[in-house]
């Protein structure tokens, strides 16, 4: 697992209070990890802070799984 993937997983575990083994790249934040719309906004903000990147609203709407977040951040972080 890449450094970015590990950091994303850590943020998801901390923000959603889920078991680390439940967090896979295929995990959907809402359907699999029990997040609500506010949780997803907070996750996006946490990703922005952790990776020092801005995630535009249109991109944020496409980030629905852990893998989506990892792919976006691998492509757009410094």
UniProtKB/Swiss-Prot annotation:
O-(pantetheine 4'-phosphoryl)serine: residues carrying this PTM: 37
Q: Which domain of life is it from?
A: Bacteria
Give disulfide pairs as residue numbers.
Answer: none
What Gene Ontology cellular component terms go with this record?
A: cytosol; membrane
Alphabetical keyword list: Cytoplasm, Fatty acid biosynthesis, Fatty acid metabolism, Lipid biosynthesis, Lipid metabolism, Phosphopantetheine, Phosphoprotein
GO function terms (MF aspect): acyl binding; acyl carrier activity; phosphopantetheine binding
InterPro entries, per the entry: ACP, ACP-like_sf, PKS_PP-bd, PP-bd_ACP, Ppantetheine_attach_site
Write the protein's name: Acyl carrier protein
What species was this sequence derived from?
Answer: Methylorubrum extorquens (strain PA1)
Lineage per the UniProt record: Bacteria, Pseudomonadati, Pseudomonadota, Alphaproteobacteria, Hyphomicrobiales
